[in-house]
Amino acid sequence: MLKFLKPKSSDEGSSKDNKSAASLKEFLDKAREDFKQRWENPAQNTACLDDFDRIKTLGTGSFGRVMLVKHKQSGNYYAMKILDKQKVVKLKQVEHTLNEKRILQAIDFPFLVNMTFSFKDNSNLYMVLEFISGGEMFSHLRRIGRFSEPHSRFYAAQIVLAFEYLHSLDLIYRDLKPENLLIDSTGYLKITDFGFAKRVKGRTWTLCGTPEYLAPEIILSKGYNKAVDWWALGVLIYEMAAGYPPFFADQPIQIEKIVSGKVKFPSHFSNELKDLLKNLLQVDLTKRYGNLKNGVADIKNHKWFGSTDWIAIYQRKIEAPFLPKCRGPGDASNFDDYEEEPLRISGTEKCSKEFAEF
């Protein structure tokens, strides 16, 4: 059982602290073993297209689409990510796509979307993920306007735990934004879209991510590390609680703002929230929370999270502040409608070399 460390001031508290720190370490050590096993022996071709009925498109992207499908044998609903191999190659996303599949088949955490099957045919790559019927945080946030601080904190805590898990496996996520956060029928989060995730020991240099969420060190083409995810968490918490992001990266002047680290806070932000955000949206890496010698503990022990029971969040025992409207397991009404296109599968195999390991 995982006990996430919770600050206590008394001596009794500190011995409890040591216990939870120890069991956290134990949990993460075991998670590392499990991950390593799957990372080094990735599963391949665990299903085929004929195993599924395709129902409707849930989303589209530059080299594919995500469809709601029903597994014929089990009757379970899934979200099937379909990527056109030739488009992936053309857009130079081979490495990212192979990374995504390899990572998804190896990770296992309550707040990360789970991949159940993967396979390929002559034309496409397929990743079959659990279907999260509540839709994207993005659409709920835009509809509601902004989330209260307790509501924002509930989601932020899940992301902190998910990043703690990923970072302990040397994985950087690199694409945090409300569009990549799904809300399940119980009101808890699932992080999806591992297209930019990467296993990095030390530093990496790739320019990728979403402009508004890019850390200064990525924009400045410096080598960067996991600290970029903690910066993005700051941007996300700000956007959840304000209803708009701290930076709009549509003009060069806005990019300069990110690099300068100047952030204005709405007057309704609490002092605790402003303090946490100043420490996450910190341009100086030697001062950014999550990147200091105490690691994630600086974030988890911050007073804005003072009321958070990390263990209960991990166990999904806290009542969610908001439940999406869901009418059963295959209900896609929380997703937008898209034009449907027939799946074209070539008679000859495309890009077999590039995707041999998929």
Curated annotation (Swiss-Prot):
Its EC number is 2.7.11.11. Coiled coil: none annotated. It holds the Pfam family Pkinase. The active site is at 175 (proton acceptor). Residues 8-19 have a biased composition (Basic and acidic residues). Keywords: ATP-binding, cAMP, Kinase, Nucleotide-binding, Serine/threonine-protein kinase, Transferase. Residues 52-305 form the Protein kinase domain. Residues 1-22 are annotated as: Disordered. GO terms for biological process: signal transduction. It catalyses: L-seryl-[protein] + ATP = O-phospho-L-seryl-[protein] + ADP + H(+); L-threonyl-[protein] + ATP = O-phospho-L-threonyl-[protein] + ADP + H(+). One of its GO terms (cellular component) is nucleus. Essential for larval development. Controls the rhythmic contraction of enteric muscles probably by regulating G-protein coupled receptor aex-2-mediated calcium influx in GABAergic DVB neurons. Plays a role in the control of oocyte meiotic maturation by gonadal sheath cells. May play a role in the regulation of neuromuscular junctions. Heterotetramer composed of two regulatory subunits and two catalytic subunits. Belongs to the protein kinase superfamily. Ser/Thr protein kinase family. cAMP subfamily. This is cAMP-dependent protein kinase catalytic subunit. It comes from Caenorhabditis briggsae. The lineage of its organism: Eukaryota, Metazoa, Ecdysozoa, Nematoda, Chromadorea. The gene is kin-1.
